[in-house]
Amino acid sequence: MTPSLKRLPEADRPRERLLRLGPEKLSDVELLAILLGTGSRGRSVIEVARDLLHHCEAKDPGGGLRALLHLRDAERSELVKGLGPAKVCTILAGLHLGLRASAAPLRRVDLCNPRAVFEFLAPRMAHLSIEQFHVILLNAKNQVIDVECVSEGTLTASLVHPREVFKTAIRRSAHAVILAHNHPSGDPTPSREDREITRRLVQAGRVIGIEVLDHLVVGQGGYTSFRERGLLTG
């Protein structure tokens, strides 16, 4: 039988501690145990949570549960005995909600500053396992109207077409756009293809009257700003 948290004094159970003390007082193990809900045969949910965090730390030192974002489905389920697809889905949903919530407060920040753009995008993009091209739509005050993913997969000029990049910008009456894509390798150094795509999009933006303010290449813990590097030419 699965060891039960009911054997613990009620005051020591994670859910009860959260309700009484607030989530900030709980350890990562306790918060993860609440998400998992139950343990596995012969192991309590606390033990499963502790093992999962240990394995994630081994794969990505200092990264914690973020390691799960880089793994394939089969690899996630093999990390810890008793971690089935349903529990993996619950954890991933919690992680992505946290990433989106951490990005939301920056929506009214002046995103002409490349560092602010990176801090806005990093929770969404820095840990993606595949390459994505995003367009940030801005109003006249450089506040975010929306963010749209226009391409997924290795970037090529055929995938990132000006028509797709500016279609929503025109429809939403955007004043300007900021381009961004991630490098799953973690290295934000722009490739020759990145430079060519940027050049074409800057030219297209000038023709239709929607300025491309910057293009950021997002890596893990760092970024390259085309504007800062003097590469925003067309």
From Swiss-Prot:
A Gene Ontology biological process term: proteolysis
Name the record gives this protein: UPF0758 protein STH371
The species this protein was found in: Symbiobacterium thermophilum (strain DSM 24528 / JCM 14929 / IAM 14863 / T)
Keywords linked to the UniProt accession: Hydrolase, Metal-binding, Metalloprotease, Protease, Zinc
Classification via Pfam families: RadC, UPF0758_N
PANTHER family the record matches: DNA REPAIR PROTEIN RADC (PTHR30471), UPF0758 PROTEIN YEES-RELATED (PTHR30471:SF3)
Span of domain MPN: 110-232
InterPro entries reported in the protein's UniProt record: MPN, RadC_JAB, UPF0758, UPF0758_CS, UPF0758_N
GO MF, one annotated term: metallopeptidase activity
Domain of life of the native organism: Bacteria
NCBIfam families linked: PRK00024.1, radc
Family: Belongs to the UPF0758 family.
Motif (JAMM motif): 181-194
Binding site for Zn(2+): 181, 183, 194
Disulfide cysteine pairs (residue numbers): none
SUPFAM superfamilies according to UniProt: JAB1/MPN domain (SSF102712)
Transmembrane segments: none
